[in-house]
Amino acid sequence: MTTRREGRELALQALYSKDLVLQDANTTLKRITESFSEGEEPTLSVNSKAYAFASELVNGVVSNLQAIDSRIAEKSKHWSMARMARVDLNILRLAVFELLYRPDIPKNVTMNEAIEVAKKFGADDSASFVNGILDEIASTVTDKE
């Protein structure tokens, strides 16, 4: 797994957990990574670059949540955000943050990564759902945005 994929997955877990327990996303991210080093099982290490990328994504989503959610709501025809699965919504939030605020990451990379994360963490139809909405949003994003 690439460092950025690991970061995206950590960020998704933090945002999802934040939605469930209504806790600060950075605190949640820290707890998730700490849980990798606790317990009696062999520890999993979290790459420091992956953690830094996850933290950047989480902070970016939280700081720009209103603009991100507005884009998602605008393009999610027939789906209110309240009806969306929390996993799918947070995958969309992460990807929309990248599309809008990280011009250094190519659009196709952002979309492919979101689809792969949706396949891993979402329901059977999550990948196609995420792809459909992201395709609509990506088509409206200019390179300078």
From Swiss-Prot:
GO terms for cellular component: cytosol. The keyword Transcription applies. GO terms for biological process: DNA-templated transcription termination; transcription antitermination. It comes from the Bacteria. Pfam families: NusB. HAMAP family: NusB. Belongs to the NusB family. Involved in transcription antitermination. Required for transcription of ribosomal RNA (rRNA) genes. Binds specifically to the boxA antiterminator sequence of the ribosomal RNA (rrn) operons. NCBIfam families: nusB (TIGR01951). This is Transcription antitermination protein NusB. The gene is nusB.
